[in-house]
Amino acid sequence: MLTLNTRINSADKVSAQLVLPYESRENSRLRTALSSGEEVAIFIPRGTVLRHNDLLMGDDGRVVQIVAARESTYRITCANPHDLLRCAFHLGNRHTQTQVGEGFLRIARDNVLKEMLEGLGATVIEEDAQFEPEAGAYGSGGHHHHGESSQGHAHGPLAPIPVHQKIHRPSDIPSR
C-alpha cells in the first residue's frame, strides 16, 4: 500500500490522481484507493484540509495529485450583494461549510437550508460541482462544536480568546 505523508508545492511528474469528496479531504488519516485500484493511506498533520490540485508525495517518492470530486451542492445567488451577504451571514450563523465564489455561495445540499435561503430571497440551484468551502476564521479547516475546548490544536492568524480570559460586557458590571 502506498503511504502519502508529505504535501509538496510542485513536482516534475505526477504519478496518479486521487479523487476525493470534501468530507474525505478533511481527514488527516484516510485509507482509500486510486482510480487504478491501488490502495493508498494518507497520513498528514491533523487539521490539514486537502484542496483541489494539492500534491502529496508517497513514501516511495511517487506524487499523487488531489482532485476535488463533483458533489451534490446548491449554488446560491441573489439579486444584489446585500442579499447575498445576508445569506452568507445566516449560513455562517449555522456553522454551515460554505464556498464563497464571485457572486455566489455554494453549500452541500440540505433542504432545510434551501428553504431558509429561498425565504431570504435567494435563488438556489442544484448543481453537481467541486466543493471547496472556506477554511474558516482560524484557517485550520477543522472545526469544533460548542462546549468543546479549542485548546490542543493550532489556529491561524486570528487567535482564540484564552479560556481563562474573561470578556467584559456592560451587563457584567454590577450597577451602582
Swiss-Prot record:
GO terms for biological process: protein folding; protein-containing complex assembly; urea metabolic process. Residues 134-176 are annotated as: Disordered. GO terms for molecular function: nickel cation binding; unfolded protein binding. Signal peptide: none annotated. Gene3D superfamilies: Urease metallochaperone UreE, N-terminal domain, UreE, C-terminal domain. It is found in: Cytoplasm. SUPFAM superfamilies: Urease metallochaperone UreE, C-terminal domain, Urease metallochaperone UreE, N-terminal domain. Its main location: cytoplasm. InterPro entries: UreE, UreE_C_dom, UreE_N, UreE_N_sf. Belongs to the UreE family. This is Urease accessory protein UreE.
